């Protein structure tokens, strides 16, 4: 019989170090069957060769930075902005858009434009948070075969990790363009309160983008690095991070280059997106009350309202009121309908007051876990776009009894901190040590569905702990070890992050076999678990079944897909550049034709104009996404028209040269004139 329960026999006080095989409970990487792998925590003494970029993969926007010597620098994208919208879209022509271009077309393509997908990463489809999101977004969230929440656009499904991978690919391309060479190594940030599945899924996104993710750093910790890089004084700092989709509060102690996290807390489903949704609901309900029309099922209308709500939210951080004007939002038998309403800051603050209040308890818990009073906090750092909202700032002041610091950019601090950690790993930044913590308690299920903790939350990582358990039934030869993360006393209320079977236990009365379970948490916060039957002290047959995520083959397919897109993106870029060159050539030729039309053979002119028309039609096809026309085809057509134009204008050039020579022969130097 296989029991899903253990009896906890740690009463004896025994503590052992596991010598059995270590198995990564990496649900998000290994899907329905996870493979065994040895794991060791790197000491960090070996330095990485080549540049290491820091990426803040945000819910609404992402940011990229790198160390230039001892100074972190934010790298602007191709559009010239220092942050990139975390938006991915698929057009009817099969083109994939990322960033600014994807966000611009969202209002006309809402069903196939993905935003805020970070809120879904590493989550199960049936989780309450996912079910709430399904009602609020215009795109389809579907259940994958492994139970995860995936996305669907134009008949194809994508994992949230894959969408994150597309965004990371964009960031990698930006960095490679800036540095003039391919970039492989990166430090990527995650919300401090992300669980193991979400961290694994983020690393998978990096793999899909072709990146070697050297370290996963908690966002508040990264912001503290950005704040404290040049600070010499010891300090205890609170980082209040309210971004687009998540909220974190971390308390750190800065001491002579050592950044030690004392505690962390938060809410992985609280951020600017929720503030937008609150305002969208208000606008839709007000319109329904005034006009008798329900817009909630009209995806196009809701997307327009969402964009207007986001804009109004930002404006109300600096204005006391703003107008929302959306003409022709819908129509009925009486004609077109429009939205015209004024929103005041006070009105908006009342709408989102419950959301702002949700940040208070995590802050109190973080202070309690750190064993600190508010008076002992030396500085409060604000991170994330929502911390620009006056009501949020006032709430922070009321919690910590002090004015927040203004020295860091809320949108860029996390990426800068990631770049600093990259500098540490590459050896460019010295005398800096980062000690982070695990955000949630870790343990296993024991008899009666009890959650038995092995590692408590806010334990400094990397860490390792072992504990001895036994069987719950006589003659039991196998046990199922179920690993959970959370703070509740029963496993049913916590997050299952993995499970595996230990077989080959020698039959014995219940309570006699000694089964040692060891937990390892590495510097990324990734969890490894091993189990060993101490009585037999031999290799056991262990099958590990993951709770969710991507299989190795799925990741490999997505990496190949990303590479394919990367190649097509480069081909597309080259085609556009050749199209621009072709248009420039055509314009120059037409200009010369107009200037010299009286001196040219008319048949030759007609042939040349025909070639110009043909070339422009080809350019139009390329711009419309015709992949049948290669870059070489374009170059050949440009060369042909240039050669033809040279022949057409040859007589003009000859006449000009002859005229110049004759005028030169007829003119003598001033001194030679008689």
UniProtKB/Swiss-Prot annotation:
It is found in: Mitochondrion matrix. Residues 655-674 are annotated as: Disordered. Residues 655-666 have a biased composition (Polar residues). It comes from the Eukaryota. The keyword Methyltransferase does not apply. Keywords: ATP-binding, Hydrolase, Mitochondrion, Nucleotide-binding, Stress response, Transit peptide. It is an enzyme of class 3 (hydrolase). SUPFAM superfamilies: Actin-like ATPase domain, Heat shock protein 70kD (HSP70), C-terminal subdomain, Heat shock protein 70kD (HSP70), peptide-binding domain. One of its GO terms (cellular component) is cytoplasm. Its EC number is 3.6.4.10. GO terms for biological process: [2Fe-2S] cluster assembly; chaperone cofactor-dependent protein refolding; iron-sulfur cluster assembly; protein import into mitochondrial matrix; protein refolding. Residues 1-43 form a transit peptide. One of its GO terms (molecular function) is ATP binding. It catalyses: ATP + H2O = ADP + phosphate + H(+). The keyword Transit peptide applies. Interacts with the Fe/S cluster transfer protein GRX5. Interacts with the Fe/S cluster assembly proteins ISU1 and JAC1. Component of the PAM complex. Required for the assembly of iron-sulfur (Fe/S) clusters in mitochondria. Assisted by the DnaJ-like co-chaperone jac1 and the nucleotide exchange factor mge1, it mediates ATP-dependent Fe-S cluster transfer from the scaffold proteins isu1/isu2 to grx5. Belongs to the heat shock protein 70 family. This is Iron-sulfur cluster biogenesis chaperone, mitochondrial. It comes from Schizosaccharomyces pombe (strain 972 / ATCC 24843) (Fission yeast). The lineage of its organism: Eukaryota, Fungi, Dikarya, Ascomycota, Taphrinomycotina.
């Amino acid at each position: 019989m296989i029991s899903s329960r253990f009896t906890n026999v740690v009463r004896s006080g025994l503590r052992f170090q596991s010598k059995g095989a270590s198995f990564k409970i990496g649900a998000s990487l290994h899907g329905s069957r996870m493979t065994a792998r040895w794991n060791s925590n790197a000491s960090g003494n070996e330095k990485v060769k080549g540049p290491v970029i820091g990426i803040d993969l945000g819910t609404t926007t992402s940011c990229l930075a790198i160390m230039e010597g001892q100074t972190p620098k934010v790298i602007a994208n191709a559009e010239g902005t220092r942050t990139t919208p975390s938006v991915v879209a698929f057009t009817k022509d099969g083109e994939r858009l990322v960033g600014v271009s994807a966000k611009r077309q969202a209002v006309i393509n809402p069903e196939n434009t993905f935003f805020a997908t970070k809120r879904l990463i590493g989550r199960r489809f049936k989780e309450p948070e996912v079910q709430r999101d399904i009602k609020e977004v215009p795109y389809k969230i579907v259940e994958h075969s492994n139970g995860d929440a995936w996305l669907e656009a134009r008949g194809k499904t994508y994992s949230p990790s894959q969408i994150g991978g597309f965004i990371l690919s964009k960031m990698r391309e930006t960095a490679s363009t800036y540095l003039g060479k391919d970039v492989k190594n990166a430090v990527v940030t995650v919300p401090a309160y992300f669980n193991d599945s979400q961290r694994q899924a983020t690393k998978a996104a990096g793999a899909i983008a072709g990146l070697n993710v050297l370290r996963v750093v908690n966002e508040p910790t990264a912001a503290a690095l950005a704040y404290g890089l040049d600070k010499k004084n010891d300090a205890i700092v609170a980082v209040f991070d309210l971004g687009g989709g998540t909220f974190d509060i971390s308390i750190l102690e800065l001491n002579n280059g050592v950044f030690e996290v004392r505690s962390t807390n938060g809410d992985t489903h609280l951020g600017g997106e929720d503030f937008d949704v609150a305002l969208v609901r208000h606008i839709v309900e007000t319109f329904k009350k005034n006009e008798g029309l329900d817009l909630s099922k009209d995806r196009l209308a809701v997307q327009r309202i969402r964009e207007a709500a986001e804009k109004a939210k930002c404006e109300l951080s600096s204005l006391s009121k703003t107008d929302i004007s959306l003409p022709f939002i819908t129509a009925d038998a009486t004609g077109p309908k429009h939205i015209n309403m004024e929103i005041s800051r006070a009105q908006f603050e009342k709408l989102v007051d419950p959301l702002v209040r949700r940040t208070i308890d995590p802050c109190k818990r973080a202070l309690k876990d750190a064993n600190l009073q508010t008076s002992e906090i030396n500085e409060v750092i604000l991170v994330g776009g929502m911390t620009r909202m006056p009501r949020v700032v006032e709430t922070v002041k009321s919690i910590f009894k002090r004015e927040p610091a203004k020295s860091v950019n809320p949108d860029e601090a996390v990426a800068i901190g990631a770049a600093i950690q990259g500098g540490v790993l590459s050896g460019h930044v010295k005398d800096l040590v980062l000690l982070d913590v695990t955000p949630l308690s870790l343990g296993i299920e024991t008899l009666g569905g009890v959650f038995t903790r092995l590692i408590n939350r806010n334990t400094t990582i990397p860490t390792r702990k072992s504990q001895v358990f036994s069987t719950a039934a006589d003659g039991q030869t196998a046990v199922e070890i179920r690993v959970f993360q959370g703070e509740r006393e029963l496993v049913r209320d916590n997050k299952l992050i993995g499970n595996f079977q230990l077989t080959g236990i020698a039959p014995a009365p219940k309570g006699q076999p000694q089964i040692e379970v060891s937990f390892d948490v590495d510097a990324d916060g990734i969890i490894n678990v091993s189990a060993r039957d101490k009585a037999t002290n031999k290799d056991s047959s262990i099958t590990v079944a993951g709770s969710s995520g991507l299989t190795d083959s799925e990741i490999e397919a997505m990496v190949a897909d990303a590479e394919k897109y990367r190649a097509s993106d480069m081909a597309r870029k080259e085609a556009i550049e050749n199209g621009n060159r072709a248009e420039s050539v055509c314009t120059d030729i037409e200009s010369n034709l107009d200037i010299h039309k009286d001196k040219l053979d008319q048949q030759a002119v007609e042939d040349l104009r025909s070639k110009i028309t043909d070339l422009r039609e080809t350019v139009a096809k390329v711009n419309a996404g015709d992949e049948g026309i290669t870059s070489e085809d374009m170059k050949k057509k440009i060369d042909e028209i240039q050669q033809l134009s040279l022949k057409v204008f040859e007589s003009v050039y000859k006449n000009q040269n002859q005229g110049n020579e004759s005028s030169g022969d007829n003119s003598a130097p001033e001194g030679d004139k008689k």
